[in-house]
Design a protein with these regions (language model features):
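Flexible, low-complexity segments enriched in proline/glycine/serine and punctuated by aromatic residues
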Residues: 2-151
Length: 151
């Protein structure tokens, strides 16, 4: 699913920047509240890395939130670009404890369901219908080696 692909993408970003794992940690965060980073983008693949691990983490989160909101595909109407892909009402929870990380992505489903998903990410925010019955979530756990440690 799209949510699974996005969660895997964030885990890959965290693995490529293990020195800043705590900078990726977010709890019940809504991508719509994100402010775009200032200045030139950081890139882990640049020949001359011009940003710190923390700056790269902030930029990774900003890029990832744009993907969650659907900015990879846009429709332009009356000169205004609007995302046409992405998850409906996404919430994000990223936990880092030592080298163990969990990435949870929640979104609003099309209809109510009897049994809620096991993930509590996004629950209780009033975004997923009455009693969170339209709450959907995917949660991935992984281990990220520390800086200089090969997996």
């Amino acid at each position: 699913s799209q949510a699974t692909a996005l969660a895997r993408d964030m885990l890959a970003r965290m693995r490529s920047n293990p020195g800043a794992l705590q900078n990726y940690a977010l709890s019940h965060y809504s991508p719509t509240a994100l402010v775009e980073p200032d200045g030139e983008p950081c890139s882990a693949h640049a020949s001359d890395l011009s940003c710190t691990a923390q700056e790269l983490a902030a930029y990774d989160v900003a890029q990832w939130f744009n993907a969650l909101r659907g900015w990879a595909e846009v429709a332009v109407q009356a000169g205004n670009a609007e995302p046409v892909a992405g998850l409906v009402e996404p919430s994000v929870c990223i936990y880092a404890a030592g080298n163990s990380v969990t990435v949870a992505v929640a979104w609003r489903g099309l209809s109510a369901q009897a049994a809620p998903p096991a993930s509590a990410c996004g629950v209780g925010l009033g975004r997923y219908g009455m009693d969170d019955r339209e709450h959907r979530a995917v949660e991935l756990r992984s281990w990220v080696p520390g800086p200089g440690v090969l997996p």
